[in-house]
Amino acid sequence: MKKNTHPQYQKVLFIDSASGHRFVCGSTLKPDATEKFEGVEYPVSYLSISSSSHPFFTGSKQLVDSEGRVEKFKKRFERKKEASPADTPPESDSTTENASVEKKAEKKRVTAKGSKK
């Protein structure tokens, strides 16, 4: 078996930034920061959202968004919507369409006259 092929598995302290909830879980992450939790020092990884702050698990209808991603997306979407042309289809060049229709009608007249002779 090859040596040094698998990442080191260790216990890491995860901290939810939105709610402040802390929990220890095994992980291959290698964070630089450390913090004491229940008398033991663990490497620390900060989460933007976890089961303690996610609306599905909390039962609330609001999303706790510490970074403002939702607002940024809404603003960007509104700007894009305003900048885009109206939802109506673009007007076609009616003169080109009329000319092609007239040519087809003329061909039908010519073939109809030729078939009578």
Swiss-Prot record:
InterPro entries: Ribosomal_bL28/bL31-like_sf, Ribosomal_bL31, Ribosomal_bL31_B, Ribosomal_bL31_sf
Bias (Basic and acidic residues): 100-109
Region (Disordered): 75-117
One of the protein's GO biological processes: translation
GO MF, any single term: structural constituent of ribosome
PROSITE patterns named among the record's database cross-references: RIBOSOMAL_L31
Record HAMAP family: Ribosomal_bL31_2 (MF_00502)
Quaternary state and interactors: Part of the 50S ribosomal subunit.
Family from the record: Belongs to the bacterial ribosomal protein bL31 family. Type B subfamily.
Protein name as it appears in the record: Large ribosomal subunit protein bL31B
Organism: Protochlamydia amoebophila (strain UWE25)
Gene: rpmE2
